[in-house]
Amino acid sequence: ATRLSVFDFDETLAFTEAEIDILDQEGNVIDTTTNQEEYDKWEDDERIKSGELKFDYSELDVITNPTEIVAVTDIMRDRSADSDTQVMIVTARSSRTSDDIHRYIDAINIPTDDLYVKAMGDEGLGRGKGGFIFSILEEFPDIREVEFYDDSQKNITDVNTAKAQALEQEMVDVFDVYLVIDGVPQKA
Protein backbone atom coordinates (compact mmCIF):
# COMPACT_ATOMS: atom_id res chain seq x y z
CA ALA A 1 0.00 0.00 0.00
CA THR A 2 1.16 3.52 -0.78
CA ARG A 3 -1.77 5.29 0.88
CA LEU A 4 -3.01 5.04 4.47
CA SER A 5 -6.61 6.10 5.15
CA VAL A 6 -7.41 6.40 8.85
CA PHE A 7 -10.91 6.90 10.24
CA ASP A 8 -12.18 7.44 13.76
CA PHE A 9 -15.39 5.49 14.51
CA ASP A 10 -17.81 7.43 16.74
CA GLU A 11 -19.26 10.61 15.21
CA THR A 12 -16.98 10.07 12.17
CA LEU A 13 -18.12 6.81 10.51
CA ALA A 14 -21.26 6.40 12.60
CA PHE A 15 -23.38 8.26 15.10
CA THR A 16 -23.84 5.96 18.11
CA GLU A 17 -25.72 6.11 21.39
CA ALA A 18 -22.75 5.86 23.72
CA GLU A 19 -22.61 7.77 26.98
CA ILE A 20 -19.64 8.18 29.28
CA ASP A 21 -20.43 8.76 32.95
CA ILE A 22 -18.30 10.88 35.25
CA LEU A 23 -18.02 9.20 38.64
CA ASP A 24 -16.89 10.39 42.05
CA GLN A 25 -14.66 8.21 44.24
CA GLU A 26 -17.69 6.39 45.68
CA GLY A 27 -18.89 5.50 42.17
CA ASN A 28 -21.80 7.97 42.08
CA VAL A 29 -22.65 9.46 38.69
CA ILE A 30 -21.89 13.21 38.77
CA ASP A 31 -22.55 13.90 35.08
CA THR A 32 -22.93 12.09 31.75
CA THR A 33 -21.34 13.05 28.43
CA THR A 34 -23.15 12.28 25.19
CA ASN A 35 -20.77 13.82 22.63
CA GLN A 36 -17.13 14.65 21.94
CA GLU A 37 -17.40 18.31 22.99
CA GLU A 38 -18.79 17.44 26.43
CA TYR A 39 -16.12 14.76 26.88
CA ASP A 40 -13.33 17.18 25.90
CA LYS A 41 -14.54 19.73 28.47
CA TRP A 42 -14.54 17.12 31.22
CA GLU A 43 -11.17 15.77 30.15
CA ASP A 44 -9.63 19.18 30.87
CA ASP A 45 -11.34 19.42 34.27
CA GLU A 46 -8.89 19.56 37.20
CA ARG A 47 -10.99 17.04 39.17
CA ILE A 48 -10.50 14.46 36.39
CA LYS A 49 -6.78 15.25 36.10
CA SER A 50 -6.31 14.90 39.88
CA GLY A 51 -8.23 11.62 40.04
CA GLU A 52 -10.95 13.09 42.26
CA LEU A 53 -13.44 12.20 39.50
CA LYS A 54 -13.08 9.55 36.81
CA PHE A 55 -14.62 8.45 33.53
CA ASP A 56 -16.69 5.27 33.28
CA TYR A 57 -16.18 3.86 29.78
CA SER A 58 -18.14 0.62 30.32
CA GLU A 59 -20.94 1.63 27.93
CA LEU A 60 -18.35 1.90 25.15
CA ASP A 61 -17.79 -1.87 25.25
CA VAL A 62 -20.69 -2.33 22.82
CA ILE A 63 -21.71 -0.41 19.71
CA THR A 64 -25.28 0.86 20.29
CA ASN A 65 -27.62 1.84 17.42
CA PRO A 66 -25.00 2.98 14.91
CA THR A 67 -26.23 5.31 12.15
CA GLU A 68 -24.06 5.55 9.06
CA ILE A 69 -22.42 8.90 8.27
CA VAL A 70 -22.58 8.57 4.49
CA ALA A 71 -20.33 11.54 3.66
CA VAL A 72 -17.48 9.68 5.39
CA THR A 73 -18.40 6.03 4.74
CA ASP A 74 -18.54 6.79 1.00
CA ILE A 75 -14.89 7.88 1.20
CA MET A 76 -14.05 4.73 3.15
CA ARG A 77 -15.92 2.60 0.60
CA ASP A 78 -13.89 4.20 -2.21
CA ARG A 79 -10.57 3.69 -0.37
CA SER A 80 -11.41 0.06 0.46
CA ALA A 81 -11.83 -0.65 -3.26
CA ASP A 82 -8.33 0.70 -3.98
CA SER A 83 -5.63 -1.99 -3.74
CA ASP A 84 -2.97 0.68 -3.07
CA THR A 85 -4.76 1.89 0.07
CA GLN A 86 -4.65 0.44 3.58
CA VAL A 87 -7.80 1.40 5.49
CA MET A 88 -7.74 1.63 9.28
CA ILE A 89 -10.20 2.53 11.98
CA VAL A 90 -8.49 4.00 15.02
CA THR A 91 -10.91 4.37 17.92
CA ALA A 92 -10.72 5.45 21.55
CA ARG A 93 -12.84 2.41 22.41
CA SER A 94 -11.43 -0.85 23.80
CA SER A 95 -10.64 -3.92 21.68
CA ARG A 96 -13.84 -5.52 23.01
CA THR A 97 -15.63 -3.51 20.30
CA SER A 98 -13.42 -4.60 17.38
CA ASP A 99 -15.76 -7.41 16.31
CA ASP A 100 -18.80 -5.10 16.57
CA ILE A 101 -17.03 -2.50 14.43
CA HIS A 102 -16.08 -5.11 11.82
CA ARG A 103 -19.68 -6.43 11.75
CA TYR A 104 -21.09 -2.92 11.37
CA ILE A 105 -18.71 -1.97 8.53
CA ASP A 106 -19.53 -5.29 6.85
CA ALA A 107 -23.27 -4.62 7.27
CA ILE A 108 -22.99 -1.31 5.39
CA ASN A 109 -21.28 -3.18 2.54
CA ILE A 110 -17.71 -2.04 2.98
CA PRO A 111 -15.25 -4.95 2.57
CA THR A 112 -13.52 -5.79 5.86
CA ASP A 113 -10.98 -8.39 4.67
CA ASP A 114 -8.08 -5.95 4.88
CA LEU A 115 -9.63 -3.59 7.44
CA TYR A 116 -7.48 -3.02 10.51
CA VAL A 117 -9.15 -1.77 13.71
CA LYS A 118 -6.86 -0.24 16.33
CA ALA A 119 -8.55 0.18 19.70
CA MET A 120 -6.63 2.81 21.66
CA GLY A 121 -8.86 2.36 24.73
CA ASP A 122 -6.86 -0.68 25.85
CA GLU A 123 -3.92 1.60 26.47
CA GLY A 124 -5.95 3.49 29.04
CA LEU A 125 -6.13 6.63 26.92
CA GLY A 126 -8.25 7.55 23.96
CA ARG A 127 -5.49 9.78 22.63
CA GLY A 128 -2.17 9.44 20.92
CA LYS A 129 -3.50 8.80 17.41
CA GLY A 130 -0.73 10.98 15.94
CA GLY A 131 2.00 8.90 17.54
CA PHE A 132 0.29 5.71 16.39
CA ILE A 133 0.09 6.90 12.75
CA PHE A 134 3.71 8.09 12.88
CA SER A 135 4.81 4.63 14.06
CA ILE A 136 2.99 3.08 11.06
CA LEU A 137 4.89 5.42 8.72
CA GLU A 138 8.19 4.42 10.34
CA GLU A 139 7.34 0.73 9.94
CA PHE A 140 6.00 0.96 6.37
CA PRO A 141 8.13 3.40 4.34
CA ASP A 142 6.21 2.60 1.11
CA ILE A 143 3.29 4.67 2.44
CA ARG A 144 3.64 8.09 0.80
CA GLU A 145 0.14 9.46 1.35
CA VAL A 146 -1.96 9.69 4.53
CA GLU A 147 -5.48 10.91 5.17
CA PHE A 148 -7.07 11.13 8.62
CA TYR A 149 -10.73 11.71 9.58
CA ASP A 150 -11.84 12.43 13.16
CA ASP A 151 -14.47 14.49 15.00
CA SER A 152 -12.21 15.36 17.95
CA GLN A 153 -10.26 18.61 17.74
CA LYS A 154 -7.75 17.18 20.24
CA ASN A 155 -7.07 14.23 17.93
CA ILE A 156 -6.79 16.59 14.95
CA THR A 157 -4.20 18.67 16.83
CA ASP A 158 -2.30 15.52 17.85
CA VAL A 159 -2.28 14.14 14.29
CA ASN A 160 -1.29 17.54 12.85
CA THR A 161 1.84 17.38 15.05
CA ALA A 162 2.68 13.96 13.56
CA LYS A 163 1.90 15.34 10.09
CA ALA A 164 4.39 18.21 10.51
CA GLN A 165 7.07 15.77 11.66
CA ALA A 166 6.39 13.28 8.83
CA LEU A 167 6.46 16.00 6.16
CA GLU A 168 9.60 17.58 7.64
CA GLN A 169 11.38 14.21 7.59
CA GLU A 170 10.09 13.60 4.03
CA MET A 171 8.41 10.35 5.11
CA VAL A 172 5.28 11.23 3.09
CA ASP A 173 4.35 13.42 0.12
CA VAL A 174 0.73 14.06 1.13
CA PHE A 175 -0.85 14.13 4.61
CA ASP A 176 -4.44 15.40 4.68
CA VAL A 177 -6.32 15.87 7.96
CA TYR A 178 -10.11 16.29 8.13
CA LEU A 179 -12.21 17.39 11.09
CA VAL A 180 -15.67 15.83 10.85
CA ILE A 181 -18.32 18.28 12.08
CA ASP A 182 -21.94 17.05 12.22
CA GLY A 183 -21.03 14.29 9.77
CA VAL A 184 -19.24 16.54 7.25
CA PRO A 185 -15.46 16.27 6.76
CA GLN A 186 -13.65 19.62 6.56
CA LYS A 187 -9.95 20.03 5.86
CA ALA A 188 -8.18 20.91 9.11
Task: Please report, for each region that a protein language model flagged, where it lies by residue.
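A short, conserved beta-to-alpha structural element at the edge of catalytic cores
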Residues: 32-45, 168-188
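Structural alpha-beta junctions
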Residues: 82-83, 108-114, 164-178
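Residues at the starts of beta-strands that form the adenosine-phosphate
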Residues: 86, 145, 176
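Alpha-helical substrate-recognition element adjacent to the catalytic core
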Residues: 2-126
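Cofactor-binding loop segments of dinucleotide-utilizing enzymes, especially the Rossmann-like FAD-
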Residues: 92, 151, 182
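Short, aromatic/basic amphipathic alpha-helical patches
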Residues: 100-109, 157-169, 188
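Conserved Lys-Pro-Asp/Glu-containing loop-to-beta segment of HAD-superfamily phosphomonoesterases
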Residues: 3, 129-159
